[in-house]
Amino acid sequence: MDLERIYRDAGAYLKGHFLLTSGNHSQFYLQSAKVLEYPQLAGRLADELARIIAAHGVEFDSVCSPALGGILAGYELARAAKKRFIFTERVDKVMTLRRGFEVKKGERFIVCEDIITTGGSALEAANIIKGLGGEVVGFAALANRGFCSLANLKNEAKSNCKLPSDVPLFALGNFEFEIYAPENCPLCASGSQAIKPGSRGN
């Protein structure tokens, strides 16, 4: 599966000067919403992701995604795997489980995002699940931005990956993009202003 071509064809492979959720800057951004707006394509991607997870022998009961970006990817993965789906969301900047969702003791979860960069939001969701007695048996995403190691593609993890090394991460593709701390951003140094994706039509 040529994930880069899928993102480019959907107009989801963006070039510019972007402020990422992590606070870092990047010249490239993957706007997964542009891919997931097509249900048939979203379903095909989720089917392949479910196949990869199953091929690695990871068994799970439910899928959890951090809102907002991970919801469609996680829901489609749960559909493909015929599992339950829940999501976490931020309330006053704190990741929380709401809306009557529950986690059973010993319930096995895949935490699914659309994109994994450093994995910070996915880790927050995982910590909520574990705090409620659940077990996180894997992480998944449509795309990995190259900082965390993938069980199915065997790339090397970088020091800023926040995901635990003993829990497998699965993705359909790996994108190696440079990211910069704001104070060391060459795009800022050239006079460009970082845009938060979604704030100006992106």
Curated annotation (Swiss-Prot):
Keyword Nucleotidyltransferase annotated: no
Q: Where does orotate bind?
A: 117, 145
Q: Read off the Pfam families from this record.
A: Pribosyltran
This entry's Enzyme Commission designation comes to: 2.4.2.10
Q: Provide this UniProt record's keywords sorted from A to Z.
A: Glycosyltransferase, Magnesium, Pyrimidine biosynthesis, Transferase
Please write the reaction equations for the catalytic activity of this protein. Answer: orotidine 5'-phosphate + diphosphate = orotate + 5-phospho-alpha-D-ribose 1-diphosphate
SUPFAM superfamilies xrefs = PRTase-like
- Whether Manganese counts among this entry's keywords is no
Q: In which pathway does it act?
A: Pyrimidine metabolism; UMP biosynthesis via de novo pathway; UMP from orotate: step 1/2
Q: Which cofactor does it need?
A: Mg(2+)
Sample GO molecular function, one term: magnesium ion binding
Q: Which BP terms in the Gene Ontology apply to this protein?
A: 'de novo' UMP biosynthetic process; pyrimidine nucleobase biosynthetic process
Q: Where does 5-phospho-alpha-D-ribose 1-diphosphate bind?
A: 93, 113-121
Hey, which family's this protein in?
A: Belongs to the purine/pyrimidine phosphoribosyltransferase family. PyrE subfamily.
Could you describe the subunit structure of this protein?
Homodimer.
- Function, in words: Catalyzes the transfer of a ribosyl phosphate group from 5-phosphoribose 1-diphosphate to orotate, leading to the formation of orotidine monophosphate (OMP).
Protein name listed in UniProt? Orotate phosphoribosyltransferase
